[in-house]
């Protein structure tokens, strides 16, 4: 693709990029209330309204982390054609960082509507000879990625534009210099451009073309749902209103925290003298005017509608969790709840997580296929994925179901769903070893009996 066309595509991407950055700012508890406040303040015209509290609430962060932890506290398990040796190779390539990266993908997708994972081959050289190759992968900021799809029902990924800014040291300068990088990836090559400054419209410094060997665009999209909609879009307006009500409440408490004194025929020169006398002597002096009216002191206290604000805050908080499909809040005690009751408690979170899992299954399938291609494996049929939710459960019920399932369904499936089993392969190995020892013991006892 020509550079000018790439520049035009990046220029047209500003609105999408801004929307993504806004969602991320809410995740870091930097809501719009911090920029806008409750109302535009003009202290000269309205000196009684000086407070400008801007209270940002992190409901969005709570809901996103809740979903990511619910889905990816435990690693996704992959099984390729029930081939234990191949499964171990894939697990080794994924590495110890896989669970953390999967969780980060869920957070990024929840914030931005989609998350992107980039994979590549890290090569080690001895002279000009390649001595080692390692499959690497990592999560890329969504705002940096512009996907280009082929026309068709399946919307196959044709190319990816990635653009980002980097600060680099420059010889002879104390401060770092900003450079803009633009990468254009296809299924065969990478075109990489470097520009001076914070825009791809600056002067071009270098351009390199590199070939890669994956025969596919080395990026995988992980969508939050079929609409690629962020979680924030479901409840942003409600959250903004909650921030405004709470901030306005704090402003009222700060502005109207003192009693207003109404003075009649005060025998002093200014109000500061009145406050000094009241504080020091607990009394004030008053005078009688020309008409014979004596002075006096009255107080006025403004009532703040506390109860009304409390009610609307409770309604808004409940609606945030309803729209965000989060776990029910302020639940005091579940006790020894049954499995059915616990599933009902998680029902909304499970519905939301199920939409993400459906999209992630297809994406993880592409990642595993790329790893198998790197390993030189082509003769496989099925990639099975197993997800384990991080949720409260009734272990007694689960163990009872597992016991009653023995002899009805395969042992490996029982182990996969047993509440005490984290590593299915290890549990199966120990189980078979134990069965072997028991069989050997029975055989020895029989031989001793016959002798």
From Swiss-Prot:
Q: Which InterPro entries match?
A: Portal_protein_SPP1_Gp6-like (IPR021145), Portal_SPP1-type (IPR006428)
Q: What is its main location?
A: virion
Query: What single Pfam family name could you report for this chain, choosing any that match?
Result: SPP1_portal
Q: Recite the UniProt keywords alphabetically.
A: Capsid protein, Viral capsid assembly, Viral contractile tail ejection system, Viral genome ejection through host cell envelope, Viral genome packaging, Viral penetration into host cytoplasm, Viral release from host cell, Virion, Virus entry into host cell
Compartments in which it is found: Virion
Q: Name one GO cellular component term.
A: viral capsid
Is the keyword Ribonucleoprotein in the record?
A: no
Disulphide bond pairs: none
* UniProt key word Ion transport: no
Source species, domain of life: Viruses
Mention one GO biological process in which this protein takes part, according to its record. Answer: symbiont genome ejection through host cell envelope, contractile tail mechanism
Role description: Forms the portal vertex of the capsid. This portal plays critical roles in head assembly, genome packaging, neck/tail attachment, and genome ejection. The portal protein multimerizes as a single ring-shaped homododecamer arranged around a central channel. Binds to the terminase subunits to form the packaging machine.
Q: How does it assemble?
A: Homododecamer.
- What does the similarity note say? Belongs to the SPP1-like portal protein family.
Q: What is this protein called?
A: Portal protein
